[in-house]
Design a protein with these regions (language model features):
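Transmembrane beta-strands of outer-membrane beta-barrel pores
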Residues: 1, 32-38, 54, 70-76, ...
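Outer-membrane beta-barrel domain signature
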Residues: 2-7, 37-43, 55-59, 79-88, ...
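Outer-membrane beta-barrel "beta-signal"
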Residues: 134-137, 163-175
Length: 175
């Protein structure tokens, strides 16, 4: 965006995931992620973890799967000095997820992923993330997308709502 003639970025995300395809039933994977989000007072977040995923059902209609993992999360927040929430935390979390990919026809794909991430040994500290995306083919390389995101934190930082949602439209280019 632009503010006062200067460009700025209010959020950023870098994510890497490696999934190993040893067999069709159990797929081990690991990932690492860095991000920040000024609207959530998040100066820095680093996450790394690993686990397994599997597909329960698949066919021409799409795919349904799930996974479980353990992850290490480190966050640094931009909080006022009077904040109750700690401004820097490191926590081990479970990460469980469900994935769904529906293909009603060759020009439409609906995907959904829901994560539930309780603190390891602190099940009252839960984060839930959900994404639903509809992609409609425009050309072989271009899709029009509509995405809905939901984020819930049972212990949000001071001044931040426990529930956050967003609706976005976009174009996805694949080459």
């Amino acid at each position: 965006g632009l503010l006062g003639g200067s460009s700025f970025a209010s959020s950023g995300l870098l994510h890497f995931r490696q999934t190993y395809h040893y067999n069709e039933s159990i797929l081990p994977e690991w990932w690492a992620q860095l991000n920040y989000d000024r609207s959530q007072l998040l100066d820095f977040r680093a996450v790394t973890g690993g686990g397994i995923r599997t597909s329960f059902a698949s066919g021409d209609w799409g795919q349904f799967g799930a996974g479980v993992a353990l992850m290490l999360e480190h966050e640094r927040l931009d909080l006022p000095a009077t904040a109750i929430h700690e401004d820097e935390t490191t926590l081990v979390r479970w990460s469980t997820f469900l994935t769904l990919r529906l293909v009603p026809n060759e020009n439409l794909v609906i995907t959904g992923t829901t994560y539930v991430q309780p603190g390891f040994g602190e099940f009252g500290d839960v984060r839930t993330l959900a994404n639903l995306r509809v992609a409609a083919t425009v050309t072989d390389e271009l899709d029009l997308t509509v995405s809905f995101d939901l984020r819930y934190d049972s212990r949000p930082p001071d001044l931040i709502s426990a529930l956050d949602t967003s609706l976005r439209t976009g174009l996805r280019y694949t080459y």
